[in-house]
Amino acid sequence: MEFTKMHGCGNDYIYFDCTRQPMDRDLASQLAVRLSDRHFGIGGDGIILIEKGQNADFEMVMYNADGSRGAMCGNGIRCVAKYVYDHKLTDKTTVTIASMGAVKAIDIQVQDGVAVGASVDMGAPILDPAAIPVVTDCKPPVDVPITVHDTVYKMTCVSMGNPHAVVFIDRSPREFPLEQVGPLFEHHPCFPDRTNTEFAFVQDRQNIEMRVWERGSGETLACGTGACATAVAAILGGYVDHQVTVHLLGGDLQISWSGKAEDSVRMTGPATTVFSGKIDL
């Protein structure tokens, strides 16, 4: 079966074009675990199936590296947009892509006939604790105290189609013990569906530095929905302006949001093809 390895700011997935070669979704979960292994597989943060859409131009079906189903991936959706354009599945530079029922509109950035990135309408942030979901009496869930391993943190919880807990720290997140603390947030009992966790340092009113621990995948070099959630949390806290650059380990994403709960968050960033190949399933 043919595959393409792609990444957005280092957040890499293995993509299967199921418009041309259908795949059983029961197989996909097992395949995600096998192929995501960076020593014995292709290596990636998971796999993404590209299918024809029913309520959108295309549908993306995402599986994390542990085989669990992912609801949305901001970096992945940009790569899907690049794939369908570069492989002539569409000639449109604005496409709609669905993931677990949520439809996003993507403006594809093209240079010399090749898609190099995309700007995505990520929809309005979800700040209702029950819908995120997170167990808290704080509405909206801003600066919520949480005790993790005898340390009290303050987090702001946001859903961008998947749950995020954003923690602002007073130093570069490169110095933060993410490998120890991230899993404790992911599996904390206040998150019924687990959570993605971002540890962020506000450099100035236009720049945020961030590391992320993704549920089901661990640390990744970038997380598009996490960058959106972090920008939303920072704007709610009054730390930054309405347009910011989020600096991740794998690259930069531009995020904008008006600060109004009903308005969409817009994410802009690159999409890159690494290589293509064939694998026996």
Short names for language-model regions:
Residues 1-22, 120, 136-158:
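N-terminal, positively charged, Ser/Thr/Ala/Gly-biased leader segments
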Residues 1-114, 165-281:
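A glycine-rich beta-to-alpha transition motif near the start of alpha/beta enzyme domains, typified by
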Residues 70, 117, 130-133, 144:
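Flexible, glycine/proline-enriched loop segments at strand-loop-helix junctions
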Residues 117-119, 123-125:
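Membrane helix-loop-helix hairpins that form the core translocation module of multi-pass transporters
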Residues 124-126, 160-164, 271:
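Glycine-rich beta-alpha junction loops
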Residues 127-130, 178:
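Short, basic/low-complexity N-terminal boundary segments at the transition from targeting/disordered tails
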Residues 129-138, 276-281:
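Extended Gly/Ser/Thr-rich low-complexity repeat segments
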Residues 155, 163-166:
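Selected transmembrane alpha-helices and immediately adjacent juxtamembrane segments
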